[in-house]
């Protein structure tokens, strides 16, 4: 207060004011500070001082012809004196106002296209709804978030190539546009920006906003998708939050969300197949998300989620070095440990072999709804500081940390046997066994842990075994904090390896991820996910399997038909028929298969009995290992819609209905595609007798040379194929039969096959 009084007294003397405003600054150190280097030392002051002058702005000389000397109010707009050191003229800020009001206008058609991200943001805010403001403690944790809604996911280098190609197409320099998205964006932008007068540099900046994901490490309490982050300053402060619903979604958030759902489904499906890694790769390569190949998205999208990271690891991409346990991301912040195998006894006297981490280590644990700092020694939890949204979330974090600590009292708290299995019916590893056990019920764990009196530390309170807060006592080593623990900020990625069972390890051999860590949460994807792989047909239930199997046969009928006649075993073993087997009652699978295979063999042997529709209908049943029996069936059962439905061997049924007029197949009322051939029963024809002893495979195939006449056919060796000219100038591909026994002397017709091949 004394100082302020003294200053007030000084300021009241006119001499003081004069010294401060009039005298020159001639202290060398000060002059040096403000004049050395090109960097402006006090931009705000400089701006105020410049704008206080009459003509602070320089402009091109041509401006004098365009702008009058005075405006309507008679104020001077430009000075006749030239700018010292350049051939520009000095103009007043009023000249800018005049220009904005009366200057030349250009077409504005390109503005919404160039400033697309801004226009879209304005729309989102216009349609967004802001709710009430709540005051209270905000648990914010720093997370790496996307701050730029509405962007594509190109790498900086890819975006640079696109921008150069769009904005400066004639510049020299090697630009290789390879990815699908690069080519698509370049084409679209070139069309949009024809005759655009906006400065190329501005266009380049705006394109960068649209093409590249920008992330920042920001304190966030609520939603982390980019449409929430763009209003972060409006929705959360130090002690308040305002509820907000965005007025629109952006594709990049939808891609992130749909990618996670697709990756989870794929990992879950791969786990139960014979070769999980090969299956996972096959599915990633054949899946599209919102029309873009999933593998392209994985290469570009930095989303860190367990299933997504497993898919990336399988593709040989680098991922974050943090590891996952119990749905929490662990990052070691200090200390080290060595791993040793140890046998321990549970409270039920069951022996578990666990890999014990020996040594003192500190970790941060970050989950969706809780975060923690964990300090542990060998099989001992030293300290755990947790913060979370609610009691449930805090409990989850405590359970995971207690199991991770490998303490003896945790293992002794196990009641009953541990026999949890994964989706593929394999036993989980011991650490996940323990985790599942206590996630089901942690009462005994918390009761046995022990409690201790606590010191009064600012911002920390204790938590009792029944999860009530306390300022006097707490579970041993466990404290609740008001402050969140920040997510690991580094974007460093490491090389990892993945084994056949989808366990991901770093180069030291530490397991970072495994399928057990993949969340079971099912969401509804925002973008359409198209799983082309037959392994994913069952994701949407039995009906989807049925429809997809028949659609696949129809789509590939040309090749299926040839395999059916030449190499049926290979056809029956196709993985596309695997999902179908789960629909066939277990007891009947082998018998159905034997029956259908016998039927097919008769069709191959007896000319004129080939029936396209019947082959398509029964083919999936032939894929199971066959049982030899003399049983005949008039219908075959499939388990869909919660009960057994039947497919008629001859004729239509609600499950499989072929309309001969429209040539379309409906499966369970859903359209399964059209047959391009005419599978009608054929009438007798001239060619029948001549073509006995030959198998008609299909349409002409040029690889087998020019069409032979019917007379030339006799020269073919058994098993040899040739194109042959029949009837009214039609050409079909035939093969001379390998077995004479199958040549029937009666003239049962081959017409049916001929007609099928021609139409």
Swiss-Prot record:
The UniProt record lists the keyword rRNA processing: no
Entry GO MF terms: RNA binding; RNA-directed RNA polymerase activity
One Pfam family per UniProt: Flu_PB2_1st
Motif Nuclear localization signal: positions: 736-739
Localization in the cell: Virion; Host nucleus; Host mitochondrion
Highest taxon above the source species: Viruses
Protein keywords: Cap snatching, Eukaryotic host gene expression shutoff by virus, Eukaryotic host transcription shutoff by virus, Host gene expression shutoff by virus, Host mitochondrion, Host nucleus, Host-virus interaction, Inhibition of host innate immune response by virus, Inhibition of host MAVS by virus, Inhibition of host RLR pathway by virus, Inhibition of host RNA polymerase II by virus, mRNA capping, mRNA processing, Viral immunoevasion, Viral transcription, Virion
GO biological process: 7-methylguanosine mRNA capping; cap snatching; DNA-templated transcription; symbiont-mediated suppression of host cytoplasmic pattern recognition receptor signaling pathway via inhibition of MAVS activity; symbiont-mediated suppression of host gene expression; symbiont-mediated suppression of host mRNA transcription via inhibition of RNA polymerase II activity; viral RNA genome replication
Record InterPro entries: Flu_PB2_2nd, Flu_PB2_6th, Flu_PB2_C, Flu_PB2_CAP-bd, Flu_PB2_middle, Flu_PB2_N, INV_PB2, PB2_helical
GO cellular component: host cell mitochondrion; host cell nucleus; virion component
Main location group: virion
Site keyed Mammalian adaptation: positions: 627
Annotated family: Belongs to the influenza viruses PB2 family.
Purpose: Plays an essential role in transcription initiation and cap-stealing mechanism, in which cellular capped pre-mRNAs are used to generate primers for viral transcription. Recognizes and binds the 7-methylguanosine-containing cap of the target pre-RNA which is subsequently cleaved after 10-13 nucleotides by the viral protein PA. Plays a role in the initiation of the viral genome replication and modulates the activity of the ribonucleoprotein (RNP) complex.
Assembly and interaction partners: Influenza RNA polymerase is composed of three subunits: PB1, PB2 and PA. Interacts (via N-terminus) with PB1 (via C-terminus). Interacts with nucleoprotein NP (via N-terminus). Interacts (via N-terminus) with host MAVS (via N-terminus); this interaction inhibits host innate immune response.
Protein name: Polymerase basic protein 2
The organism of origin for this protein: Influenza A virus (strain A/Swine/Iowa/15/1930 H1N1)
Gene this chain is encoded by: PB2
């Amino acid at each position: 207060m004394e100082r302020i009084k003294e200053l007030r007294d000084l300021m009241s003397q006119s001499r003081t004011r004069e010294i401060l405003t009039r005298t020159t600054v001639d202290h060398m150190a000060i002059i040096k500070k403000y004049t050395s280097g090109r960097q402006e030392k006090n931009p705000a002051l400089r701006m105020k001082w410049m704008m206080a002058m009459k003509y602070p702005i320089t402009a091109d000389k041509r401006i004098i012809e365009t702008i009058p000397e005075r405006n309507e109010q008679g104020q001077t707009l430009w000075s006749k004196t030239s700018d010292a050191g350049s051939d520009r003229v000095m103009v007043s800020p009023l000249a800018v106002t005049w220009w904005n009001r009366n200057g030349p206008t250009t077409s504005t058609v390109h503005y919404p296209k160039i400033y697309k991200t801004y226009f879209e943001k304005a729309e989102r805010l216009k349609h967004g709804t802001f709710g009430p403001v709540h005051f209270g403690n905000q648990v914010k944790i720093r997370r790496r978030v996307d701050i730029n809604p509405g962007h594509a996911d190109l790498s900086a280098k890819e975006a640079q190539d696109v921008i150069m190609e769009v904005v400066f197409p004639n510049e020299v320099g090697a630009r290789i546009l390879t990815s699908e998205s690069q080519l698509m964006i370049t084409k679209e932008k070139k069309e949009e920006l024809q005759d655009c007068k906006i400065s190329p540099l501005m266009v380049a900046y705006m394109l960068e906003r649209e093409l590249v994901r920008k992330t920042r490490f920001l304190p966030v309490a609520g939603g982390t998708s980019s449409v929430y982050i763009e209003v972060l300053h409006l929705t959360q402060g130090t002690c308040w939050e305002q509820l907000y619903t965005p007025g629109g979604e952006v594709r990049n958030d939808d891609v992130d969300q749909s990618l996670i759902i697709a990756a989870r489904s794929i990992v879950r499906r791969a786990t139960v197949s014979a070769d999980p890694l090969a299956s996972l790769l096959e599915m990633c390569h054949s899946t599209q998300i919102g029309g873009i190949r999933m593998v392209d998205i994985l290469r570009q999208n930095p989303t860190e989620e367990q299933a997504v990271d497993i898919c990336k690891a399988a593709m040989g991409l680098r991922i974050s070095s943090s590891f996952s346990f119990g749905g929490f991301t662990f990052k070691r912040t200090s200390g080290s440990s060595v791993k040793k195998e140890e046998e321990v006894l549970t409270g039920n006297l069951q022996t578990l072999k666990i890999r014990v981490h020996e040594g003192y280590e500190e970790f941060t644990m970050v989950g969706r709804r809780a975060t923690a700092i964990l300090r542990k020694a060998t099989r001992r939890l030293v300290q755990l500081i947790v913060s979370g949204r609610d009691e449930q979330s805090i409990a989850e974090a405590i359970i995971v940390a207690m199991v991770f600590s490998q303490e003896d009292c945790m293992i002794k708290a196990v009641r009953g046997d541990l026999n949890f299995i994964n989706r593929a019916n394999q036993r989980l590893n011991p650490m996940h066994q323990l985790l599942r056990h206590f996630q089901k019920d942690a009462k005994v764990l918390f009761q046995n842990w022990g409690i201790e009196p606590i010191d009064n530390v600012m911002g920390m309170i204790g938590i009792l075994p029944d999860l009530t807060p306390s300022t006097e006592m707490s579970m041993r080593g466990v404290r609740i904090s008001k402050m969140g623990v920040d997510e690991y900020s580094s974007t460093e990625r490491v090389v990892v390896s993945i084994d056949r069972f989808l366990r991901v390890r770093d180069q030291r051999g530490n397991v970072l991820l495994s399928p057990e860590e993949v969340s079971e949460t099912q969401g509804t994807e925002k973008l359409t996910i198209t799983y082309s792989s037959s392994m994913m047909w069952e994701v949407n239930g039995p009906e989807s399997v049925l429809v997809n199997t028949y659609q696949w046969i129809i789509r590939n009928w040309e090749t299926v038909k040839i395999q059916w006649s030449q190499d049926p075993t290979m056809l029956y073993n196709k993985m596309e028929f695997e999902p179908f087997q789960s629909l066939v009652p277990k007891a009947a699978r082998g018998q159905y298969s034997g029956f259908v295979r016998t039927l097919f063999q008769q069709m191959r042997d007896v000319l004129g009995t080939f029936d396209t529709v019947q082959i398509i209908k029964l083919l999936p049943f032939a894929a199971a290992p066959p049982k030899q029996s003399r049983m005949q069936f008039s219908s075959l059962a499939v388990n869909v819609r919660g009960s057994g439905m039947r497919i008629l061997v001859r004729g239509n049924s609600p499950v499989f209905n072929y309309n001969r007029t429209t040539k379309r197949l409906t499966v369970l009322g859903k359209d399964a595609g059209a047959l391009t051939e005419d599978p009608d029963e054929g009438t007798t024809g001239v060619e029948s007798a001549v073509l006995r002893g030959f198998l008609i495979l299909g349409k002409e195939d040029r690889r087998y040379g020019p069409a032979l006449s019917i007379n030339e056919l006799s020269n073919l060796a058994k098993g040899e194929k040739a194109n042959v000219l029949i009837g009214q100038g039609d050409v079909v591909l035939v093969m001379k039969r390998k077995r004479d026994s199958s040549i029937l002397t009666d003239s049962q017709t081959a017409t049916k096959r001929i007609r099928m091949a021609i139409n």
